């Protein structure tokens, strides 16, 4: 570190320009040339608010204030943003809040205390390690922050329950933990599980290196300065020379960090041309140190317990377990992670459709509700009008019936009364005739009187039985029955799809299309019963593999692994997978997860080469497995040969059949040579489609091995096109 000189007056030290009262570390960070050092640590701890006024979006922390006179680049103008940053952030220094600094022609004029905040550039509550300025749409930050303090931390440690906490929160838990003899019981704040940890001031928990790397990358992209002040990251020293110079390269073969002089002195021999060199990284060195045996390095992975192992851990705790090398473990976990991502993308497609459907349904509720209310109102108004019309008609019928009935009764009473009066007179006349003593006079009129009485009896009619009924009984109205009929016409409520209260919504179907790659090692000199066909050919020999229309993964539909959802009459539809699938049967095929009809059996679909690991004289290729049944794989690899004048042709190096694994390792390759690989699957119905051409270049003897873990670009593009 060079001598701290004042930027305003280089001829004097910064203490002469700045009063002793304001000789804080922040002022030193501004007024001295130490501001140009990117590894200068922050003068305050993480939990304090003072980070001064650094321009956090600068690639180098040289712009320290809103005034660009502090920047090394006078053309900065507070726009010294990196390509990945979107905004320019400043942080307020709480220790200099009452200081007013004025300048005149680039020289320090005075430093006056004031009751006002002179350096108030940003919010006083802004923390450089709190993700407050992050966009709300960022879902990654929730997995990077500590769940207790909700801050971004470069170093977090994993509990046995797989929850990660920062060191500060772990120390707080340790203070309040219950101590039992030489152990303290640590309770996870996330899942409330108890863990027995040794009572010590050292941290006996593995560090979550993946979260640390992702957090550092996140800070670099979003303008956080905390990653620059990481005290744990220091220079890597040479492990060979005594002067302990800074290491320049690391030899993977020798497992040593070498400076430039030692590299030339000990690795310039021809015998060491196959050694692999990589750049030195403190993160890689710390990650491979066993937490239980600091003197040993991690070199294997236990499949049984899913743990990283060193040589001592394997002998002591994992003897007899299924262990693999780190390279093969990375390959398997990469394939498993890719398969899990593919499964979720298939489920996410259905989830997005469901969410979109419900969002549309939710937004249409208000408009549909008003329309429905209007429809119900108009309907009941019509019903009321009909009832009122019926009431009017019935009332008129009752009135008319009463009037007509009264007329008929009056007519009957009048006619019958007249007839009765007439007959009463005739009867009185007949009674007087019976009193006559003269026979001639009686006999002269007796017959006539009898005939008149009988005729009068015959002409006297009985009343109509309908006249005896009451007028209200003529119009029968059972209002109780009408009310019940009306209630039955209207529905009581919406019908549910599942009437049983015990039934629960089923999960989304999982479309499993990938298998975890298994360990296998092949070489061109140890294939056993397998056949290798050697021949020369040009690019025309595999023109079908370059046919983009045939080889594109998007041209192949997803296998129908389950029946479509059954439609129901209700609002909700659930996936019914019961009875659709069968347990896997034991067979020699790779893939027998789903039951297919005989008509659906076909040749294997396309596969994807998702990972390659290339050495100077060897290469290892990993590929996925299609959804159809597979008996074996077949590979062809070509070498690109350059012939004068600048002509490039392909030469078939080998054709390998009956491969029973999802990876293949080839040896005896030529360094600094370009190779092309393609793979296809074979079953009883014949060979499937060739995969896309995978091009690799073997490095020279002094280069580093080239490997890509995780998803390759062709996997990502195929995944995006497919989903």
Curated annotation (Swiss-Prot):
<keyword id="KW-0479">Metal-binding</keyword>
<dbReference type="InterPro" id="IPR001841">
    <property type="entry name" value="Znf_RING"/>
</dbReference>
<feature type="zinc finger region" description="B box-type 1">
    <location>
        <begin position="235"/>
        <end position="280"/>
    </location>
</feature>
<dbReference type="InterPro" id="IPR017907">
    <property type="entry name" value="Znf_RING_CS"/>
</dbReference>
<dbReference type="Pfam" id="PF00041">
    <property type="entry name" value="fn3"/>
</dbReference>
<dbReference type="InterPro" id="IPR003961">
    <property type="entry name" value="FN3_dom"/>
</dbReference>
<keyword id="KW-0175">Coiled coil</keyword>
<comment type="similarity">
    <text>Belongs to the TRIM/RBCC family.</text>
</comment>
<feature type="binding site">
    <location>
        <position position="290"/>
    </location>
    <ligand>
        <name>Zn(2+)</name>
    </ligand>
</feature>
<feature type="domain" description="Fibronectin type-III">
    <location>
        <begin position="603"/>
        <end position="701"/>
    </location>
</feature>
<dbReference type="InterPro" id="IPR017903">
    <property type="entry name" value="COS_domain"/>
</dbReference>
<feature type="binding site">
    <location>
        <position position="293"/>
    </location>
    <ligand>
        <name>Zn(2+)</name>
    </ligand>
</feature>
<dbReference type="Pfam" id="PF00643">
    <property type="entry name" value="zf-B_box"/>
</dbReference>
<feature type="domain" description="COS">
    <location>
        <begin position="434"/>
        <end position="492"/>
    </location>
</feature>
<keyword id="KW-0862">Zinc</keyword>
<dbReference type="InterPro" id="IPR013783">
    <property type="entry name" value="Ig-like_fold"/>
</dbReference>
<dbReference type="InterPro" id="IPR036116">
    <property type="entry name" value="FN3_sf"/>
</dbReference>
<feature type="binding site">
    <location>
        <position position="318"/>
    </location>
    <ligand>
        <name>Zn(2+)</name>
    </ligand>
</feature>
<feature type="zinc finger region" description="RING-type">
    <location>
        <begin position="146"/>
        <end position="192"/>
    </location>
</feature>
<protein>
    <recommendedName>
        <fullName>Tripartite motif-containing protein 42</fullName>
    </recommendedName>
</protein>
<dbReference type="InterPro" id="IPR000315">
    <property type="entry name" value="Znf_B-box"/>
</dbReference>
<feature type="zinc finger region" description="B box-type 2">
    <location>
        <begin position="285"/>
        <end position="326"/>
    </location>
</feature>
<keyword id="KW-0677">Repeat</keyword>
<dbReference type="InterPro" id="IPR047153">
    <property type="entry name" value="TRIM45/56/19-like"/>
</dbReference>
<dbReference type="GO" id="GO:0008270">
    <property type="term" value="F:zinc ion binding"/>
</dbReference>
<feature type="coiled-coil region">
    <location>
        <begin position="382"/>
        <end position="412"/>
    </location>
</feature>
<dbReference type="InterPro" id="IPR042765">
    <property type="entry name" value="TRIM42_RING-HC"/>
</dbReference>
<feature type="binding site">
    <location>
        <position position="313"/>
    </location>
    <ligand>
        <name>Zn(2+)</name>
    </ligand>
</feature>
<keyword id="KW-0863">Zinc-finger</keyword>
